[in-house]
Amino acid sequence: MPARVLNCKSIRLGSYGEKIEIREPEAATSTPESEVEMQRINFDEEVRVAIVGAGGYGRVALDVLLAGGIGDRVLGFYDDAHAALSGEVRGVPILGDVGMLKSMLSVEPVHVVVAITDNGARLQVANALRSLGARFLTSVHPEAYVSAVAVVGDGCVAAPGAIVQPDAALGSHCFLGPRSVVDRDAEVGAGTWISAGCVVGPAARVGARAVLGQNSSVGRKAVVDSDVEVGALRHVDREGG
C-alpha cells in the first residue's frame, strides 16, 4: 500500500536489502517496483487523521501535522491511558483508547499516525491496526528534507531539520528526530528511533526497532543489529553495533 504522505514530494514506499529487516514481516508488501511511487493525499477531499499516543511523541507528531497545514483534519488522540490524561492536547481532544479507534476503522477509513515511543509497542499496535484496514500517514515537517530517490516506509515521522539522502531506505514507523541524518545508501529497519542530531553514515545498516541516542553516529558501512540501543554521543564503526 503506497505511503500516505504529508507535505513532501519525494517519498516512496518500498523495501529492499536482503540482510536487513526494512519492514516487519506482518506488514510486508508485495507491491511491484513499478507501482511503488508515492501517492499524495488529496487534502481537498475529506481526510481524517487519528494519532495513537497522546504523550511526548504524540505532541511531536501533532506539531508536524500542524506545520503541514492539516491540523484541522486531526480527529484526535487515542491512548490506552486516556483516563489519566487531560482531555486535550493543544486543543485536540483525547477521544479514548485504541480499542475505540479499532471500532471506528470497521466503519470508516482513517489515516493513522502511531506515535508511541516504545518501538516494539509501536509496531505491534501498527500491525494490529493495519490488519483492520488502517492507512498510515507518513508525516514530514516542511523544514525536513527527503531525497526524491530515497525510500521511506509508511507511518514514519520526520521532525524539523531531518535529512534523508539519496538511495537511503527506512522501514515503516520510524522516527527521525530534529537535525538527524540518514546518509546515502543507508538502510534503517522498521520501527527504529533516530534521535535528535544522530547521523547514520553512508551505506550503514541499522536493524529493526533500534534506538539511536542523541548525537550518536553510525559510521560508513557499519551495522547496528535489531533491538540494539546506541547511547547518546556514541559512535559505532564496526559490524554488529
Which residues make up each language-model segment?
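Phosphate-bearing ligand-interacting subdomains
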Residues: H82-Y145
